[in-house]
UniProtKB/Swiss-Prot annotation:
Belongs to the UPF0297 family. Pfam families: IreB. Transmembrane segments: none annotated. This is UPF0297 protein Sca_1229. It comes from Staphylococcus carnosus (strain TM300). The lineage of its organism: Bacteria, Bacillati, Bacillota, Bacilli, Bacillales.
Length: 87
């Protein structure tokens, strides 16, 4: 039996999860480097889900698409609330 005839299993646990902070930092820096307003572009992506808001440069688009938008928003809100609690 040929290896191509077997059903392969894919385990998401084997794929390293992207660190939300490092991805957002890269996306932010890439947007700034390209002359965009990073906050507006990221918000546009989060609200619409349209990856066209994020450039392909520096793998920014590929990186941010690997993370669920809900997970990004959860991280942003959590960090915002924790930061405002400290002030």
């Amino acid at each position: 039996m040929n290896n191509y005839d077997k059903t392969m299993r894919f385990n998401l646990d084997d794929v390293p999860k992207e660190n939300v902070k490092s991805v957002l930092t890269n996306v932010y820096n890439t947007l700034k480097e390209r002359g965009y307003d990073p906050v507006n572009q990221i918000v546009g992506y989060l609200l619409s889900g349209d990856p066209a808001y994020i450039p392909r440069h520096n793998e920014a688009r590929n990186q941010i698409r690997r993370i669920d938008r809900d997970e990004i928003m959860e991280e942003l809100v959590s960090n915002y609330l924790n930061a405002s609690k400290d002030n």
